[in-house]
Amino acid sequence: MKTLFFTLLVLSSSLFLGFTNCNSSLYHSAETSLDNYWYQGKAEISRFELEQARYGEIHKGDALMIFVTEDFRTDMQVKLDNEVNKDKAINVMKLNFVREFPTGIYDYSAMTSIFTPIKDYKTERCLKITNSVQEWCGHVFTQLNWQDGKRYNAKSFSYFEADGDKDFELKADYLEDEIWNIIRINPKNLPLGRVNMVTSTLYSRLGHWSLRPIEADALLSVYEGDEFEGEELMEYELIYPEHARNLKIFYENVPPYKIQGFQETYKAPFWKGGEKMTTTAKRTHTILSEYWDKYSLKDRTLREKLGLKE
């Protein structure tokens, strides 16, 4: 039954694109409650128990999602610090998405920052994405900036010869990295059907794939499993036939649309057997905090509230 539902979603993308713009019983109109949640001067910080697929094995670690609203200058594409320039800024949802996990003797640390307009999402695309990955061999950095209302200017810097330093343009319908923010702002805006999608900057780095738009099937259904828990869970899935990869995001269909977890399945390198492996993350803790002021030794107790090691 679930397979049939997925198939209908792909074949009838135009129908579902129309569906996402109407008042469906699947969604709750909650602009006021969302405003009350997001504009209280605090960030939402969630910790996830992470099982990261890497080098043909599963490595345990932590993932963090830090969601916060802030004023963002559209001309410089930076956080507004001076109120004199407020007329040049709009309000955005910022996500700092962190993954930390050890592989053998050395650690991986990755963070992606995503800046998405809130009120003007239909007229403004995701404005900026940055990604950095550090491990003992070296580190890489990627940045995408929305330009001229039609393209992304992309820059990538890498220690690795195969990657090198690059400066290029991207044209695409959507960026995978912005999907997380779309869910939190308004899941009715999620793309459905066959779309052109730029795979995530982290996946591009870990897989040494070029950052470019490829075809993906975007599916939405009510979650029917029991591995993830939450209120009125929905399952959003991106399937990339070219990469034999899929990403599933599980989120609550009640404001503020909390993300309960995700699964990412793809093939291990051929020299590690080439078998499919799955990264899994499950939300364990969430707090609301002005984390930017919590830098004293006495604030380390907040790490325990997040399920993080001292």
Task: Give the residues covered by each predicted segment.
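Positively charged n-region of N-terminal signal peptides that target proteins for export
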Residues: 1-5
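Hydrophobic helical h-region of N-terminal Sec-dependent signal peptides
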Residues: 6-13
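Bacterial Sec-dependent signal peptides at the C-terminal "C-region" and cleavage site
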Residues: 13-30
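Acidic, serine/threonine-rich low-complexity disordered tracts
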Residues: 25-148, 192-310
